[in-house]
Amino acid sequence: MLINHLSKIRTVRHFSNIKPVLSKEVSRRVIVAPASHFKTSSPNVKSNIPIHEYKQLPEDSNYIEKHYKELQVFLNEFLIKKLNKTYADFEGDPDELVFQLEKFIELEVTPRYTNHSAPDGCEERFKSIGDRIVVDRYLDFVKDVRLTLLLNGGHSFIFDVMLQAKEVFDKMQKE
């Protein structure tokens, strides 16, 4: 009877949510590549950021103007150094610019300011409160870049223009 009972035992699959030791996960953010990255995407796929005629940013566009430092760092450390591009090179594909920015934050900014020896789910992953502020500022930066692109018709050249104008203004102030 015991043998009959044992023969009816089914194997059960067990799932585990333990991440592998060699995982590349830095944060719990999910980054989705634009449709242009997938071979199966059709050419008619609409962009998340609509592309239309250029519209000037409002006078109170402090949401992007407060990020001059981040604009410059992203341009110098990632776009020019790794991709050999400027902001204007993403004209016509604003989703790609946002994706590259999210990738930069996830793969370069976040690891630079986090402590990888801290246990998962621990709020003290950041080396200091200042490091957390830097990462949060970059996360705000990507939101503000997306908002700017939505408001101005998806034209990325504006970021190059803003940086050039600030450089000229700073030179004038020094004189």
From Swiss-Prot:
Coiled-coil features, chain-numbered ranges: none
General remark: Present with 2160 molecules/cell in log phase SD medium.
Keyword vocabulary terms for this entry: Mitochondrion, Transit peptide
Its biological purpose: May be involved in mitochondrial iron or copper homeostatis.
Compartment annotation: Mitochondrion
Transit peptide per record: 1-38
Superkingdom field: Eukaryota
Main location: mitochondrion
A Pfam family it matches: FMP23
Extent of the signal sequence: none
Keyword flag Nucleus: no
Name recorded for this polypeptide: Protein FMP23, mitochondrial
Designated gene of the protein: FMP23
